[in-house]
C-alpha cells in the first residue's frame, strides 16, 4: 500500500510529490493529465448511469400498480410516467415494460461507460495532446476552452430537442390538465411567442408571481424547450467558431479549477431551481405521480369537507366558522370566492381537479352545488391524506396523522435533496473560486503542508 512514507508504488505523475495532492484529493492529481482525467470522468458517468439503471429496475421490481407511485417512495418511475411511458387516463399505469426497458438500457450503457473509464484510467495515454490533438487541451488555451464549451452547449440543446420530439411526434407526454383528470397527449400547439416565454424570466420569484416555476401548461414548457434548445445550439456554434473577446479574456480566470467553480455555481442554481419546481409545480411534476403539493393537499382537505358537509345539509355559502369568516367559503383580498379556514393562505393554488369548479370570480357556488364529479372527490380525498409535510407546527390546516402509514412524499425527498445538494455545490463553488482566484493572483493557496498534522503521524501499516 502506498502511504506518504512509502513511495514504492510509482503513479507516473499522480503521486503527492509531483502533483502536490494526496490520493484522497481525487481528480486534482489529474489536472494536467488529460487522458487520465478523461478516464475519471467517463468512469464517473458510468457510476451515474449505473445508479439510474439499477435504481430504475429496483423501482420496477417493487412497483405495485394498485397503489399510487407517490405512496411507494418512487422517484424515477414518476419521471418516466411524466414522459408518457406506460400510463393512460388519470395517470393509471397500464404497462410497466417501458420502465424495464429504460432500466436495462441504462444498465447496458453504464457497462460501456465503465469499460471506457477503466480503459482511459489504466491503459490509455496519460495525455491526449500528442496522440489525439482534437481531444487534447491546455487549460489556459482560451480558444480551445470555448470550443469545448460550445460542444457542451450543442449537446444540451440536442437534449432539449429530444423532449420536444417526444412531446410532439413520439407519443406525447402526460398532461395533468387533460379533461377528465389527466391523460397522455401530443403537444401540437406549442407556445413560441418570446414575450410569453421570456416573460416568465422577468416575473418576480415571490408569491403568486413565481418566476419560471409558475408555468402551468405544457404548451409553454415544450415551446420553452424549443427556444432553449435553439439558443444552446446556436450559442454552441458561436463559441466553437469564435475566440473570446478581450473583455472576456480579462474578466475570467482561465484555469481548470476556475472552470470547476463556474460549473459548480451553475449546478447550484439548477439545484435550487429544481427544488422549487418539484415543490410548487404540479404541471411539470404531475400530482398523480409525485403526490400533491403542500398547498394542493391543504385545499384538497377543505374541498373534501365541503363536499361531506354539503351532503349532510350544510349551507356552504353562508356557514360561519369560529372566527366569523366563512367556514367553507370566503372572499380573498381581491374579491374572489376562495376556500375558508386555514387553507385561505393557499387561495391562489391551481390544480386540475379544482379548476373546473371556478367561475369568472373565483369558486362558483352553483358549480360547487351541482357539478362536482366523483373523480374530483376521490382525488381530493387521496391528496388530503398524502400531504408532502412533516411539521411540528401548523401545516395549513391539513390533518396530519402521526399513526398513519409510513409515508414521505417524493416531493419532499426531491425538494430536500436538491436544496441540500444545491447548497453544497454553492459552497464548493465558493471554495474552488477562491482557490482559483488566489492561484491566478499568484499567492499561496490552501494550507502549508509542512505543518500538516498527518505528516508527523505513524504510517497506518
UniProtKB/Swiss-Prot annotation:
The modification N-acetylthreonine is found at residue 3. It holds the Pfam family PSII. The chain crosses the membrane at residues 57-81, 122-143, 166-188, 243-263, 279-300, 435-459. GO terms for cellular component: chloroplast thylakoid membrane; photosystem II. Binds multiple chlorophylls and provides some of the ligands for the Ca-4Mn-5O cluster of the oxygen-evolving complex. It may also provide a ligand for a Cl- that is required for oxygen evolution. PSII binds additional chlorophylls, carotenoids and specific lipids. It is a multi-pass membrane protein. InterPro entries: PS_antenna-like (IPR000932), PS_II_antenna-like_sf (IPR036001), PSII_PsbC (IPR005869), PSII_PsbC_sf (IPR044900). Keywords: Acetylation, Chlorophyll, Chloroplast, Chromophore, Manganese, Membrane, Metal-binding, Phosphoprotein, Photosynthesis, Photosystem II, Plastid, Thylakoid, Transmembrane, Transmembrane helix. It comes from the Eukaryota. One of its GO terms (molecular function) is electron transporter, transferring electrons within the cyclic electron transport pathway of photosynthesis activity. Residues 1-2 form a propeptide. [CaMn4O5] cluster binds at residue 355. It is found in: Plastid, Chloroplast thylakoid membrane. The modification Phosphothreonine is found at residue 3. GO terms for biological process: photosynthetic electron transport in photosystem II. One of the components of the core complex of photosystem II (PSII). It binds chlorophyll and helps catalyze the primary light-induced photochemical processes of PSII. PSII is a light-driven water:plastoquinone oxidoreductase, using light energy to abstract electrons from H(2)O, generating O(2) and a proton gradient subsequently used for ATP formation. Belongs to the PsbB/PsbC family. PsbC subfamily. PSII is composed of 1 copy each of membrane proteins PsbA, PsbB, PsbC, PsbD, PsbE, PsbF, PsbH, PsbI, PsbJ, PsbK, PsbL, PsbM, PsbT, PsbX, PsbY, PsbZ, Psb30/Ycf12, at least 3 peripheral proteins of the oxygen-evolving complex and a large number of cofactors. It forms dimeric complexes. This is Photosystem II CP43 reaction center protein. The lineage of its organism: Eukaryota, Viridiplantae, Streptophyta, Embryophyta, Tracheophyta.
